[in-house]
Amino acid sequence: MKKILIVEGNLREENESFSKNGIQTHTESLKDSLSHFTNELSFDVVNPSSDQNIQLISDKLENYDGLIWGGSSLNIYDDTPEIKKQIEFMKDCQKKVKKILAICWGMQVAVTAAGGQVKKANNSHIGIANEIEVNENGIKHPLYINKDLSLIHI
């Protein structure tokens, strides 16, 4: 079984608000989505902005087969203690974890932690892909089992 660390980008207070209103947190959604396709993953969740035991997790990062750092409503341009904690934790992750999937906010934190700069877009963005075709290897992935591939092409 592969051990995956999921990093929560939102502040604890925001996640509590989501839960109180019947909305899944980003972390819960990631866990549910991945568990739907395989039962060969185990998950730990950490919130570097809120967790008091973050150093204990940092000391054990080598024990994870991979890491997923998801989204957040935070803004990388803000200079808050919570964001600084996330950037410092990402620096540890980049040194100790071989496989990192950074999604949206996670990518902004990864770029900043690596010394890069995230620039504001001139306008809003939406990730829309066109003319994507699933190749021979991709079609074997569990995501596409029993799927009508004519619906996948955009």
Q: What do the predicted segments below correspond to?
A:
Residues 72-73, 104, 108, 117-118, ...:
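Gly/Ser/Thr-rich beta-alpha loop segments that engage phosphate groups in nucleotides
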Residues 31-35, 111, 133:
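Class I S-adenosyl-L-methionine
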Residues 9, 114-154:
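Pocket-forming structural segment of enzyme catalytic cores
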Residues 94-114:
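Catalytic nucleophile loop
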Residues 1-88, 92-96:
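N-terminal beta1-alpha1 cap of cysteine-dependent amidohydrolase-like domains
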Residues 37-39, 112, 145:
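Short, structurally constrained coil/turn elements
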